Amino acid sequence: MLKLVKLSRENYPLLVEMMEEWTECGEEIIPAAIRKTDYRNYEVYRSSLELSKEEADRSEGRLVEDSTFFCLDTDRNLFVGAVSIRHSLNQGLLWNGGHIGDGVRPSERGRGIGTQMVRLALLECKRLNISPVLMVCRKTNIPSARTIEKNGGVLENEVEKDGITWKRYWINTLP
């Protein structure tokens, strides 16, 4: 069973294992929220995962309040991915970023974990009264587009930024 959890001292070794796998693969670690600081220092890393409303307000629109969750496979006691939920959108996130950033660790891809993880993130968005939810992916990232579509994503448009085409989807979380 999968569930979204916050980082704690107890599950920190699971994070280190996941981040080391990602680093060894040489792939970009996604979502960006989990690569902002060095994960090898628990206290510094933990404090970098959440941006409060007050901190976001002080940034004069450059940053938004967010929450970071790790996806725990409780049957295997394994972090299989992570999601970052942005509580609002600034101009940059409106065009390229969206409310949810998500990533599945390399060894766990192709198993439907992304679809389940996004479903759990959407439930959290509903709890936070975020609706509709914007999700964005590269046009070339077919698995991510499928994950969004399986979770009710409706394609609004495609936009190009810095030579990359991004697909923008909206998902209603409220009845």
Locate the predicted segments by residue.
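GNAT-family acyltransferases
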Residues: M1-H99, E124, G163-P175
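Conserved beta-strand-loop-alpha-helix junction that forms the acyl-donor binding cleft
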Residues: M135-P143
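Conserved GNAT acetyl-CoA-binding A-motif
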Residues: C125-V136
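Conserved catalytic-core motifs of GNAT/GCN5-like acyltransferases
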Residues: V136-C137, G152-R168
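A short, internal acetyl-CoA/4′-phosphopantetheine-binding micro-motif in the GNAT/acyltransferase core
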Residues: L72, R86, H99-G110, R138
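Glycine-/small-residue-rich active-site loops that bind phosphorylated ligands and cofactors
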Residues: N77, G92, R109-G110, T140
